[in-house]
Regions:
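Hydrolase active-site cap/lid region
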Residues: 184-232
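Conserved alpha/beta-hydrolase "acid-adjacent" motif
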Residues: 263-269
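Catalytic histidine-centered segment of alpha/beta-hydrolase-like enzymes
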Residues: 288-299
């Protein structure tokens, strides 16, 4: 097996964690300013978060509260945060944001302010078993791409049924492993998802792991990467997954954003995805890696806003 491929594979998980831990926390802290939290505890349904912002004229302006929202998928309880723009009396679009490997909802909050200003409700959540920091379930030994897809499908269907949501304007935004899950979900619910945004999407996960474990007998009961244990089921489920054949079932607009210095996810995979999709574009951020610095995120956010504004 090619040594560089092994390094890339291991780097995917290791660097994802490192980038999230070092970069995304800074990113969130830069985007979510002067945060005030009123925590009512897990016994209640809501933890209110008030954001104090400045409007265009520098005046203090209080944004709508963020609240916790649990969504049930069978016996899986999904913890998330919903942020709503000021109520206009009309149904509102929603952006559902999926984190990457060993991430959490906190890494997705950076999207909220700008999308709320566009009139979008935003929902960021913790995949059960998707992270050691997950408030849904932190048993990563049970991590599963297919379970995460099922969770995201359930979230989409939940919001589609809500009276304050524009069911014809549901957007998925996924980063890294969350990008793979979002792409699979859009393909499985092509009528329910309106637009798809993939940020340095890890569409390579099945191929990379199959290269790492060529035979089923090679897969151990537990694979531990950066102290994150992953069970055998994770690898068994993706062995026959044909990502690029599957994701092209989604025929609606797709935006992919990636840095040209991404050492974890190959730009070739993103280019291949653009060719597979019916309507897709790739925005490349110069010198950006697998995870964006604040100014790179600002560029990404600008492209995403433009994409969502298009008819």
């Amino acid at each position: 097996m090619n040594k560089n491929k092994i390094i890339t594979l291991l780097g995917f998980f290791a660097m994802s964690m490192m980038v999230m831990a070092q970069g995304s926390e800074k990113l969130v802290s830069n985007q979510i300013l002067n945060q005030k939290v009123v925590d009512e505890g897990d016994s209640g349904m809501f933890n209110a978060v008030a954001l104090e912002e400045k409007d265009d004229k520098g005046r203090d302006e209080k944004a709508n509260n963020f609240k916790t929202l649990w969504i049930k998928n069978g016996d899986r309880n999904i913890f998330g945060i919903i942020g709503k723009p000021h109520y206009t009396g009309k149904k509102q679009p929603i952006a559902i944001i999926a984190h990457g490997f060993n991430g959490s909802h906190t890494y997705s909050l950076a999207y909220f302010n700008e999308l709320n200003k566009m009139g979008y409700q935003c929902y960021a959540f913790d995949f059960p078993c998707g992270s050691l920091n997950s408030r849904s379930d932190n048993n990563t030994h049970n991590m599963s791409i297919l379970d995460e897809q099922s969770d995201l499908e359930t979230i989409v269907k939940y919001f589609k049924s809500q009276p304050d949501i524009d069911a014809d304007n549901i957007v998925l935004i996924g980063e890294s492993q969350g990008g793979l899950v979002s792409a699979l979900t859009a393909a499985s619910l092509p009528k329910d998802v309106t637009k798809l945004v993939l940020v340095f999407p890890a569409l390579c996960i099945p191929d990379n792991w199959n290269q790492r474990y060529p035979k089923v007998s090679d897969i151990p009961d537990t694979t531990t990467l950066w102290d994150v244990p992953i069970g055998r089921r994770f690898f068994l489920e993706i062995r026959d997954m044909d990502v690029f054949k599957t994701i092209k079932r989604f025929k609606k607009p797709v935006l992919i954003v990636q840095g040209d210095a991404d050492a974890v996810v190959s730009m070739d995979d993103s280019r291949r995805a653009v060719k597979n999709y019916k309507t897709a574009s790739l925005h490349v951020i110069p010198s950006a890696g697998h995870g964006f610095k604040p100014h790179e995120f600002e560029e990404s956010m600008g492209v995403i806003k433009e994409f969502l504004s298009e008819e």
